[in-house]
Curated annotation (Swiss-Prot):
Protein topology in the membrane: Single-pass membrane protein
Record's protein name: Potassium-transporting ATPase KdpC subunit
Quaternary structure (record): The system is composed of three essential subunits: KdpA, KdpB and KdpC.
NCBIfam families listed in its UniProt record: kdpC (TIGR00681), PRK00315.1 (NF001454), PRK13997.1 (NF010601)
Keywords, comma-separated and alphabetical: ATP-binding, Cell membrane, Ion transport, Membrane, Nucleotide-binding, Potassium, Potassium transport, Transmembrane, Transmembrane helix, Transport
Species in which this protein is naturally found: Bacillus cytotoxicus (strain DSM 22905 / CIP 110041 / 391-98 / NVH 391-98)
Superkingdom in the source lineage: Bacteria
Pfam families: KdpC
PANTHER family listed in its UniProt record: POTASSIUM-TRANSPORTING ATPASE C CHAIN, POTASSIUM-TRANSPORTING ATPASE KDPC SUBUNIT
Amino acid sequence: MTEKQNLFGPVVRLTGVLVVLCGLIYPAMVTGIAQGVMKDHADGSLIYEKGEIIGSKRIGQEFTSAKYFHGRISSIAYKAEGSGSNNYAPSNPELRQRTEESIEKWKEDNPSVPVREVPIDLVTNSGSGLDPDISPKAAYAQVDRVAKETKISKEELKAIIASHIEGRAFGLYGEERVNVLQLNMEVKKRIQ
């Protein structure tokens, strides 16, 4: 037997073992642990309405109607297959132009809110293009518009927002946030 033939058997066996280990055992183990420890996350954090999936708590959706709260700006129009955004440096003139355009759009949609009070997350693009959450300040900044369009009182809308504020992860990481889809589902219930 040649040296090449002596190596062939162990290489084939090692390949087979690695395929089974990495392609079957490891994924099955990780899936099993995820299903046991955090089933909602493992299943995609899906949100149902009348038995139909209407979205995910983890992936943002575009809301353009004035009667609903709006999320972060998405460079990819919330298409999950192409996650990402133009990551402009602060010195890039295109970032300034894009932000100024967002501010102008904000002023058209929300004339009662002074520009100096516009939360940054409503006029800057999401890094992933899929952010499902906004800051509580961003939600409260939209109350006048939503109240006008839906005839829900401002006080009631503020209470809805307050009830949907999620704290920091583990009390340490990130910032307080409001899930836009869940918030808008509550608004939809109130106007039906």
